[in-house]
Amino acid sequence: MTVTVRFAPSPTGYIHIGNTRTALSNWLYASKNNGKFILRYDDTDVERSKDEYAQAIAVDLDWLGVRPDRVEYQSKRFDIYAKAVEKLKTAGLLYACYETADELERRRKLRLARRLPPVYGREALKLTDAEKAALEAEGRKPHWRFLLPNFESDPFATQRTEVHWDDLVRGPQTVDLASMSDPILVREDGTYLYTLPSVVDDIDMGVTHIIRGDDHVTNTGVQISIFKALGATPPVFGHHNLLTTISGEGLSKRTGALSVGSLREAGYEPMAVASLAILIGTSESVTAAPDMAALAEHFDLASISKSSAKFDPSELDALNRSLLHEMPFEKAKPRLEALGICGAKAESFWLAVRGNLDRFSDVSHWWQVVSGDLPEAPDLSGEDRDFVRHAFDLLPPEPWNGQTWKSWTEAVKSATGRKGKNLFMPLRLALTGQAHGPELADLLVLVGLERTKSRRP
């Protein structure tokens, strides 16, 4: 058996960090088991689904390193769903209902008043053909419900009916179908709700494992019933915990909360995003994995907590810095060249500045510092300005090396009597225009004698 998983986003908005957790969990599970990953767009809502969102999802996944083995669109598979609908109707497992939303709400309140579970009472099963025809003559169109197998022979005598599965994340799970309403699978306008196309596609595409958020746990009991009604063996399920904002609010792709695109535009490394999305809310320590292979080594569905996990952007900042500070030159080289940073001193430059980067784009600033004019004029007091001028008069001749900074500052210390911060800070400001940054012993060699002299105040 080939392990086959799927990620099925709705292209009605941009995917956020929570969706990323699901996509990466499926991708890593498939990778660790030599399996296949299907990207399946749940675009049956033709009014809200947009191609621009589908394209954005593809771009986001590619940026994260998730490359599908197969891409499908549910909007192109309506004929397949129609056949499944007819199969369920023929088996007497899909029945027509005509209630309006207001009528259903009144019935729900009535059941609550009678201390009964607020589930659908299957009143539509009692309708005669003549009554159905009369309702349709009024202009009503039926929606179609799936008859849950929570009874022996009389659908109005429901009884406790347990659906069991061994969840990859949560362990043994049980759902009682008697506590649930028969789900609507087909709307009045003939369009499909999520449940039916999802099951039909999982069967047709040979999906063996479904890994998704734990907000689908109850829904799994219904879907297992539909799998069996269509004559298929249900796949293995795994339900990971959900991510929330730092304040505990749920993430929504429609509000753009922590969307993958916004994180990319903010300059985060894809592996920083992937590492946090996968490792947060698990028993694993949250560290930055340099690549997907390394992240896969730490990926274990059994390590996921059953409680929701709060996504803290400050953790993402720390992971991003960690990746940049450890990034070897060969990995950074193509990106440096794209920014015009190349030549004999490119490697020594990268090794000098990487430890001070929050975002990769920060290298452009430091390249300007070592190879051009200062982006900002140094803010030196009169006394410090005189000190720097004296210090620059003591600059040693080239060639310079890693010891030049030490020998120069020792000479300046002897000549001026300054030491510590009073010595180093004015020199840093004069050389870089900033109070903080990479080691000056490394930067001085990169700046060179002539450019250093040009910065004499």
Curated annotation (Swiss-Prot):
It catalyses: tRNA(Glu) + L-glutamate + ATP = L-glutamyl-tRNA(Glu) + AMP + diphosphate. GO terms for biological process: glutamyl-tRNA aminoacylation. A motif ('KMSKS' region) lies at residues 250-254. It is found in: Cytoplasm. It is an enzyme of class 6 (ligase). InterPro entries: aa-tRNA-synth_I_cd-bd, aa-tRNA-synth_I_codon-bd_sub2, aa-tRNA-synth_I_CS, aa_tRNA-synth_I_cd-bd_sf, Glu-tRNA-ligase_bac/mito, Glu/Gln-tRNA-synth, Glu/Gln-tRNA-synth_Ib_cat-dom, GluQ/Sye. Its main location: cytoplasm. GO terms for molecular function: ATP binding; glutamate-tRNA ligase activity; tRNA binding; zinc ion binding. The keyword Repressor does not apply. Keywords: Aminoacyl-tRNA synthetase, ATP-binding, Cytoplasm, Ligase, Nucleotide-binding, Protein biosynthesis. SUPFAM superfamilies: An anticodon-binding domain of class I aminoacyl-tRNA synthetases (SSF48163), Nucleotidylyl transferase (SSF52374). Its EC number is 6.1.1.17. It comes from the Bacteria. GO terms for cellular component: cytoplasm. ATP binds at residue 253. A motif ('HIGH' region) lies at residues 9-19. Monomer. HAMAP family: Glu_tRNA_synth_type1. Catalyzes the attachment of glutamate to tRNA(Glu) in a two-step reaction: glutamate is first activated by ATP to form Glu-AMP and then transferred to the acceptor end of tRNA(Glu). PANTHER family: GLUTAMATE--TRNA LIGASE, GLUTAMATE--TRNA LIGASE, MITOCHONDRIAL-RELATED. Belongs to the class-I aminoacyl-tRNA synthetase family. Glutamate--tRNA ligase type 1 subfamily. This is Glutamate--tRNA ligase 1. The lineage of its organism: Bacteria, Pseudomonadati, Pseudomonadota, Alphaproteobacteria, Hyphomicrobiales.
